[in-house]
């Protein structure tokens, strides 16, 4: 689907399916809402899929891999070559996300949407890395749309293969810089308030990073009311690709799990493009990056975990898969009040 076709297919979650799922939970022989957010999330997933019979047996992680030209400004501790190394390690089960996926019973799909050199992972390359946003726009508007459509395509493909839920992840040196820039614009924040040390910058490095972001925003003047313009001028291909996954999930009625800071920025972009996307987003954890709480407050979707994680790659998103499996085991397998010939609990007024 094109971006335009995708947006036409996005509708709010199915309230009838949500009501049916809630009624089933209330008939299960346990105190009402005693599994808390686990129950709420299953109800939300029923609304996303339009079916109270929730099936998440096939689970995926899509990792958007791309380089960022802004690394030329010295805003990272690691060199650009690390992006390709880690991206190819996903397929060798030598990266954190791939190891967690194996344990969680999920399949990983690393996508080369913009690595600076050729790679051996799934190819949907829009550019060989973005331009240096300190000097010129990161990409054209057309390239930003193309990156969004890569994410949409991935969801369509995975739906055809029977996947019922998709987690989002990324790999790209310099992407906390681009994510902070996008956040600063969309949420009208000073860059100093939404910029962290990334993978381990010194105090001097952090000041440089903040300065680069502030100058890039002043140079390009991205329009906060136009998320695609923001992505094109100060964003990254990985962010745009993940935003496309969120858009595609909403259009295809598949729940999409946000990971940490960068993934949540992508979710924010998708929701700003189409507000109904919010109904299809599950947030997994609270990252250590300073902007995370600001973004989560803007998204207004409760998170599952607070484990001080900040690795990226989709690691936090995949970590909630076993929790969802346990929730669904209760939802689908536990006896009801009628099975036990017991009276239902009555909600307190």
Give the residues covered by each predicted segment.
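N-terminal loops that bind phosphate or other acidic moieties
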Residues: 2-349
